[in-house]
């Protein structure tokens, strides 16, 4: 996945036409589009290929099952046209290996959740985040998911992985995270959803956040 704008759109809407319209409007400001269960369950897997006309698609299914089931899920995701999948790390190395094995077959990427962005994400996952990060490096994942709502945690994860993996960071905007703060902490991409797709002008909102990111990068 190429790093140009350093922003990923989290497209958590449930209407096909709305999703396509937003994706087309903001395409110049995002490096990828992240889709999850709300949109996929409402419209079907075919929406992935439709959105891929505008930007690479990350399937945020937080895959968390036994190796064989993980393998089957990832097969469907990549056959549908996704460029990457997000998986949970707490299920262990064998389950992660199954996802990476399928991704390698298709020439695609795997992002591993180290810690989620909501307050509850600090209750159980935080204590395992560093071990998950180390495992992701050893397994050969492409990147980690770390919370924009807690930039200090992004900084800690970056210390562990160095430049061996990328970091995508959700929670910018509606959840309280600030794009420039998390880029400064070491994230490669920020993930923004409601602040863009619920804005009166998604294009203007995306442009504004993209400019904030670029200003931070210029200041580094």
UniProtKB/Swiss-Prot annotation:
Pfam families according to UniProt: OMPdecase
Catalytic activity: orotidine 5'-phosphate + H(+) = UMP + CO2
SUPFAM superfamilies noted in UniProt: Ribulose-phoshate binding barrel (SSF51366)
A GO MF term: orotidine-5'-phosphate decarboxylase activity
Enzyme category, top tier: lyase
Catalytic residues, chain numbering: 62 (proton donor)
Pathway given in the UniProt record: Pyrimidine metabolism; UMP biosynthesis via de novo pathway; UMP from orotate: step 2/2
GO biological process: 'de novo' pyrimidine nucleobase biosynthetic process; 'de novo' UMP biosynthetic process
Gene Ontology CC annotations of this record: cytosol
Binding locations of substrate: 12, 34, 60-69, 117, 170-180, 193-194
EC numbers for this chain: 4.1.1.23
Keywords from the UniProt entry: Decarboxylase, Lyase, Pyrimidine biosynthesis
Gene3D superfamilies: Aldolase class I
Role, per record: Catalyzes the decarboxylation of orotidine 5'-monophosphate (OMP) to uridine 5'-monophosphate (UMP).
Family: Belongs to the OMP decarboxylase family. Type 1 subfamily.
Subunit: Homodimer.
Name of the featured protein: Orotidine 5'-phosphate decarboxylase
Organism (species): Methanosarcina mazei (strain ATCC BAA-159 / DSM 3647 / Goe1 / Go1 / JCM 11833 / OCM 88) (Methanosarcina frisia)
Lineage of the organism: Archaea, Methanobacteriati, Methanobacteriota, Stenosarchaea group, Methanomicrobia
């Amino acid at each position: 996945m190429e790093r140009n704008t350093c922003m990923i759109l989290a497209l958590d809407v449930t209407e096909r036409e709305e999703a396509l319209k937003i994706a087309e409007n903001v395409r110049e400001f995002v490096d990828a589009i992240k889709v999850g269960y709300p949109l996929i369950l409402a419209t079907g897997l075919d929406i992935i290929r439709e959105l891929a006309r505008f930007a690479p698609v990350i399937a945020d299914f937080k895959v968390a099952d036994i190796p064989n089931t993980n393998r089957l899920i990832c097969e469907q995701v990549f056959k549908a046209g996704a460029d990457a999948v997000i998986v949970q790390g707490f299920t262990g190395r064998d389950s992660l290996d199954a996802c990476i094995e399928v991704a390698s077959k298709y020439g695609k990427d795997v992002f591993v959740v180290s810690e989620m962005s909501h307050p509850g994400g600090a209750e159980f996952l935080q204590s395992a985040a560093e071990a998950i990060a180390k495992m992701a490096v050893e397994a050969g994942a492409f990147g980690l998911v770390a919370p924009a709502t807690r930039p200090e945690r992004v900084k800690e994860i970056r210390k562990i992985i160095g430049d061996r993996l990328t970091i995508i960071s959700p929670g910018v905007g509606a959840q309280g995270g600030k794009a420039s703060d998390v880029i400064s902490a070491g994230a490669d991409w920020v993930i923004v959803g409601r602040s863009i797709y619920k804005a009166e002008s998604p294009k203007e909102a995306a442009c504004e956040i993209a400019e904030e990111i670029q200003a931070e990068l210029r200041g580094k």
